[in-house]
Amino acid sequence: SKIGINGFGRIGRLVLRAALSCGAQVVAVNDPFIALEYMVYMFKYDSTHGVFKGEVKMEDGALVVDGKKITVFNEMKPENIPWSKAGAEYIVESTGVFTTIEKASAHFKGGAKKVVISAPSADAPMFVCGVNLEKYSKDMTVVSNASCTTNCLAPVAKVLHENFEIVEGLMTTVHAVTATQKTVDGPSAKDWRGGRGAAQNIIPSSTGAAKAVGKVIPELDGKLTGMAFRVPTPDVSVVDLTVRLGKECSYDDIKAAMKTASEGPLQGFLGYTEDDVVSSDFIGDNRSSIFDAKAGIQLSKTFVKVVSWYDNEFGYSQRVIDLLKHMQKVDSA
């Protein structure tokens, strides 16, 4: 089935790159703020992930990538986007604005059949690849791919809980800057700290990522919460999860469980490394979460801290496509 992308920002553009790399068919892009000519430029040149390796051009009022024609719309309101004109049925809602079932459902007016919100949602069912995809059913029309941080945390929490039982835990994500932040101090009425210069500061921030794990792994509901520090790096973030466990274990036991999961049921979603890595080593890594065996610590047999990396842009965008593929498989069955 054909895919449409609403919002051609960091995630929208990388979802298109991800789609092209695995043969998923994107037929339309909507963005009211980006003219076609500028779309070509923005898609081709990326300061973080490099110049796009294929061919990008505009032709007959369309965006053409590697010979594939993508229809471009510039509508402000989702209900005005004529998705059916381009044959787009599965929509990636990556504006960051229409994150509830009601708001995202506006896409159906233009002929869309399903919507994946590329952000957490207050009411849409949330999915994390490798964790709860089996809960998806045909009758769901608007779903959420959760957040990049939830996608990093959930696989790690799943492995810990299934093997050693999480009693309770606190998460900190040391998170790269995103587009909502300011280059220098500026107005940010809802989040005063968030309005401070992104390149000059370590900025404490809130995140719903840990609580959201309770939505995708119901047994952990109410057992995890967390916060974030925004730091002056352009991409790649890291989750630090401190947990009290119900079963006694050694840190080596935890490493073994993570390694086994990364090579088995969670392959492609959870990675494992014993190397002396730093954040930039993960730019362009398409896994959701890469467990850092050397960085974790243990205080007692039931009290540990685990560390896991993620490319918050690229890995997450790959998951959006993975979720779409799963939905299409279930929907066509």
From Swiss-Prot:
- Entry keyword Cytoplasm: yes
- Which keywords does UniProt give here? Acetylation, Cytoplasm, Glycolysis, NAD, Oxidoreductase
Q: Provide the positions where the record notes the PTM N-acetylserine.
A: S1
GO process annotations (BP): glucose metabolic process; glycolytic process
Subcellular location, record wording: Cytoplasm
Name the catalytic site residues: C148
Which SUPFAM superfamilies does this one have?
A: Glyceraldehyde-3-phosphate dehydrogenase-like, C-terminal domain, NAD(P)-binding Rossmann-fold domains
Task: Return the InterPro entries for the record.
Answer: GlycerAld/Erythrose_P_DH, GlycerAld_3-P_DH_AS, GlycerAld_3-P_DH_cat, GlycerAld_3-P_DH_NAD(P)-bd, Glyceraldehyde-3-P_DH_1, NAD(P)-bd_dom_sf
EC no. given is 1.2.1.12
Note the Pfam families from the entry.
Answer: Gp_dh_C (PF02800), Gp_dh_N (PF00044)
Q: Which reaction does it catalyse?
A: D-glyceraldehyde 3-phosphate + phosphate + NAD(+) = (2R)-3-phospho-glyceroyl phosphate + NADH + H(+)
Q: Pathway, according to UniProt? A: Carbohydrate degradation; glycolysis; pyruvate from D-glyceraldehyde 3-phosphate: step 1/5
Query: NCBIfam families annotated for this entry?
Result: GAPDH-I
How is the subunit organization of this protein annotated in UniProt? Homotetramer.
Give the family this protein belongs to, as stated in its UniProt record.
Belongs to the glyceraldehyde-3-phosphate dehydrogenase family.
Q: What is this protein called?
A: Glyceraldehyde-3-phosphate dehydrogenase
Identify the species of origin.
Homarus americanus
